[in-house]
Amino acid sequence: MNKFRTFPQINTLIEDESLKSYPFYIKAFFCKKVVAKLKENFSQDEISKDKLLLEIKKEIKTFYRKDLQSVINASGVVIHTNLGRSVIHEELYEACKDIICNYSNVEFDLENGKRGSRYALVLEKLKMLFECEDALVVNNNAAAVFLVLNSLCYNKEIISSRGELVEIGGSFRVPEVIKAAGVKLCEVGTSNKTHLKDYEQAISENTALILKTHKSNFALMGFHSEVNIKDLHELAKEKGLLSYYDLGSGWCENLNEKLIKNEPKIKKLVQECDILSFSGDKLFGSVQAGIILGKKELIEKLKQNQLLRMLRVDKLTLSFLNESLKAYLQKDYEKIITLKLLNDDLSFIEKKALRVQKELKFQTQLKKSKSLVGGGSMPDKSLDTYILTFQGDALKLQTRFRKENIIGRIENDEFVLDFRTIRENELQKLILIINQMENL
């Protein structure tokens, strides 16, 4: 006897009136999923159709909520990797809209009617902004590291300090990327101290390159030392090797003066090594991309690598990056939202917080606090900010606000909203959402 005979037929569930408004493929998928799940945990109790439909509707609602949605970043982390890192300014989006929604000359030369280079759109601007010989763009900085090493050092050896063999988000480790690129790693120095002589003594006939990796997502304090890229480049040049700086983050122009100490400036570094790469969506404040700058002959080798086809960027990335570069070249820094949020002064942040506090129907306290740069950038630096704190169970409040797409944080056992990362055009929306919430 079939023990599942009490289960309603799948077709009966799909055709039920209460699911009529949902697309067929979606309701069919979840009807099958819920029934299969109940069969796995089968008990002899009779399964009612109403109970199944209730569970199916719950699954469908959860599915719709899982769509990519805009959130209000009240966490105080400016470059929040889990929230998409840098935000694109509305005017930059509008400038890209015509390209994205239509055919474009992404790889077509309008002057001669022949195939063109998809990188031509941004190459001139990158060379202009950073004063480098040549440039290339791939889909992120991990891809940039992989491409550089695979193109220039395949089946050879590179030298790197033990103190710079970092792990970035999602458990991606520099040594693993090096290995995957077909390159042998020679580690030198210790976790806290590496000297120039350590690199020099490690050079062998199989050495191709000296790698320096910027410690952008952690800070070494106390008894430590490292070798700067300029000295490494001079050593590499003397020994007939290449020097490569995996910068990861790095800044371009107009950054808050409190942040720039010990944080490398890209334009300066590109003159001090053969090749470097960094992320487009960190301190540069644009779209996700791996931006590679360096000597022309080295970039040409990268362009000849068959892997570039797999790592190339699409017209969306190129369009947004192009508009960001134009904003930098025109010194229109207000359009680089990451820079704006990092540069906003304390009085402006206080005004935003006071405006919201005044219009909320719930009691809050205004306090000074600290914001973080985030995105694996400047881990040892923080920025003054203002927060609003809410009374009540902090964890429950955090969950309530998160369900309304407001991402705050818990500080000193209180749920808080940090106004450095809440943009001015989000304030009224924030007020409306909170005032509609009940029993805070």
From Swiss-Prot:
Kindly list the GO molecular function terms attached to this UniProt entry.
Answer: L-seryl-tRNA(Sec) selenium transferase activity
Fetch the Pfam families from UniProt. SelA
Q: In which pathway does it act?
A: Aminoacyl-tRNA biosynthesis; selenocysteinyl-tRNA(Sec) biosynthesis; selenocysteinyl-tRNA(Sec) from L-seryl-tRNA(Sec) (bacterial route): step 1/1
Which EC class heads this enzyme's classification?
Answer: transferase
**Keyword Cytoplasm attributed:** yes
Q: Where in the cell is it found?
A: Cytoplasm
The record's Gene Ontology cellular component field reads:
cytoplasm
Q: Which reaction does it catalyse?
A: L-seryl-tRNA(Sec) + selenophosphate + H(+) = L-selenocysteinyl-tRNA(Sec) + phosphate
Predominantly, its location class is cytoplasm
Q: What cofactors are annotated for this protein? A: pyridoxal 5'-phosphate
Which residues does the record list as N6-(pyridoxal phosphate)lysine (modified residue)? K282
Domain of life per record: Bacteria
Report the EC code(s) recorded for this entry. Answer: 2.9.1.1
Presence of the UniProt keyword Transferase in the record:
yes
Kindly list the biological process annotations in GO that this record carries.
conversion of seryl-tRNAsec to selenocys-tRNAsec; selenocysteine incorporation
InterPro entries noted in UniProt:
PyrdxlP-dep_Trfase, PyrdxlP-dep_Trfase_major, SelA-like, SelA_trans
Q: Briefly, what is this protein's role?
A: Converts seryl-tRNA(Sec) to selenocysteinyl-tRNA(Sec) required for selenoprotein biosynthesis.
- Its family? Belongs to the SelA family.
What is the name of the protein in this document?
Answer: L-seryl-tRNA(Sec) selenium transferase
* Originating organism: Campylobacter jejuni subsp. jejuni serotype O:6 (strain 81116 / NCTC 11828)
> What lineage is this protein's organism placed in?
Bacteria, Pseudomonadati, Campylobacterota, Epsilonproteobacteria, Campylobacterales
Q: Which gene encodes it?
A: selA
